Amino acid sequence: MPSMKDKTEETKNRIIEVAKRHFSEKGFDATRIHLIAKDVGVNKALIYYYFKNKEAILDHLIQTLLNDLSKIIMAFTKDNIIAMIKEGRLNIRDGHWRFMSEEDAGNFYEAGLRHCENMVDFVLAHRSVIRILVFESLKNGKYKNAIFRFLNLLHDKGKEPDSTNILNTDTDFKYNVDNFVFKFFFGFIPLFNFAAYYDEYAKSSGIGERELRASFMRCYEKM
């Protein structure tokens, strides 16, 4: 028999999932708490017990997305970049990545492709939240700057969160403005747009979802 704690967590998760669907389908502004409560099968008071308002629900969705995406990026950095530097197989100097052998370069390239696959799978799995985020960022409302929270994945007071670890490993490592701009506009934004428009593009173009994903991967790998 589920414990009270388990039931409480289950109810909270149901609220989050239903709210996510409403936000994605109707838009954040058009979504009403009483409609979320009706679909969940609870009264409004219970929703307010877990969340102060619908903004708090969206904040939770965005922060969870941010945290999970950060884990993927940090894991790749630790398992590949930092590991190769420590093993003497990679040296980063003046923005140039120097591998000690062609084999090392090839191994890193393959790891990078797997990382791209993981990132694409992640944004597609969370495309309903990303769709909300992208559309809300285009409005002149509270969440117009929400997408820029992801800049914190690129830098924190001028430094990338994982760049500190790289710098501690390789003192020649430097990060500049071009790196930040490239990662945001040619890294995150294409991924977010792909996820946000994935379903509608598949319907409009007649391309199957599997082929659409494969086509995007081929294009993304060239960037």
Q: What positions do the PLM features span?
A:
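Helix-turn-helix
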Residues: R14, V18, H22-D68, D79
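Amphipathic alpha-helical packing segments from all-alpha helical-bundle domains
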Residues: Y109-E110, R114, N118-D172, V181-F182
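N-terminal intrinsically disordered/low-complexity leader segments
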Residues: M1-E10, R21, I81-I85
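Short acidic/histidine-centered micro-motifs embedded in hydrophobic/aromatic stretches
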Residues: T64, I132-E136, F186, P190
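Soluble or luminal CAZymes and related metallo-dependent hydrolases
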Residues: D104-N107, A111, H115, A146, ...
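C-terminal peripheral helix-coil segments that are non-catalytic and often amphipathic
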Residues: I82, K86, D121, A125, ...
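Amphipathic alpha-helical linker/stalk segments
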Residues: L61-A111
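Phosphate/oxyanion-binding loops and surfaces in catalytic or ligand/nucleic-acid-binding neighborhoods
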Residues: T64-D68, I72-D79, F122, H126, ...
